Each structure stands twice: as C-alpha cells, then as structure tokens.
C-alpha cells in the first residue's frame, strides 16, 4: 500500500489555500488554481500543512487520497514556482514562432500549422527550433506540450520531429541491400 496520502503538503509563504466543502482553491504569486475533491477524501488545513484523509474505509479510498494529495502538491508547487516544458524541433526546415496566443509551426507539411495556446500558458521561442511552455497548471503545460509534439513525433531513422529536451529517441539502422 502506498503511503503518499499520509504525508502532509507543506504550504510555502505567499500561498493561500481556501477550502469550501469539496472544493479547494490555491492562490499564489504566479496564479490561482481550483479543483473539486473526490467524495471519499476529506482535506483539512493545520497551520501551514494540508492533510488528506479518507471519509470511510472503502475500497480505493486510500488510492483517491494519495491522488488528491499529489494533485494538491502540484497545485501548491505550480502557483509558487510554476512548471516548464521545453521542446526541440529537429529536421531540415522545421521552425517554430510564437505569435501572440498561437504558435506557428513549419514541420515539413504542405501547410503551416497554427496551434492555439490555451489560457494560462505562456509560449516562448528562444530560437527557431526551441519552444518553451510555462504555466502554473502542471496538467495543462504537459498536455499542451504533448499536443504540439503529436504534430510530428520523432521518427527512429533520422530522428526528425518534435521532441522534449530530455527525451531519448531510439534510433534504428536503415535497411541494407
């Protein structure tokens, strides 16, 4: 059994947490996030700690408590420090350009791709082949990065495509005659 739910979430200075029924709102210097808590889980605040516990000992309750604790921890970390994902475009003519609330991608197709950046995410392009996504919602930052990567996943023969900075692409050898 995992013991994740038993560890409290430490709330840093500058972050305020509001509990109202099954809803939790976390405000910090970077932004504000809110979430509805599962009905099997009860969340309480003691000084600068958030404690998750179960309502009744039913199957899967501790699993939900552990998930809730991890989600709250990500919310607290997101509004205090923020999250960041970096993507690299590798291939001849592959380019990216941030234009307001959209990202213009040239990925070898016959047409350019305009990807809309969701609210709460900032997109920067330090160079034509690098994309940096920042935000306070870990799920939204990761999902946006995954959506951009899905346009042209890295292929195993030449390694062309959109990849994460720390991603390792297994290479294959070309067919021999």
UniProtKB/Swiss-Prot annotation:
GO terms for biological process: cytoplasmic translation. InterPro entries: Ribosomal_uL6-like, Ribosomal_uL6-like_a/b-dom_sf, Ribosomal_uL6_a/b-dom, Ribosomal_uL6_bac-type, Ribosomal_uL6_CS. Pfam families: Ribosomal_L6. Keywords: Ribonucleoprotein, Ribosomal protein, RNA-binding, rRNA-binding. The keyword Kinase does not apply. GO terms for cellular component: cytosolic large ribosomal subunit. One of its GO terms (molecular function) is structural constituent of ribosome. Part of the 50S ribosomal subunit. Belongs to the universal ribosomal protein uL6 family. This protein binds to the 23S rRNA, and is important in its secondary structure. It is located near the subunit interface in the base of the L7/L12 stalk, and near the tRNA binding site of the peptidyltransferase center. This is Large ribosomal subunit protein uL6. The lineage of its organism: Bacteria, Pseudomonadati, Pseudomonadota, Gammaproteobacteria, Alteromonadales.
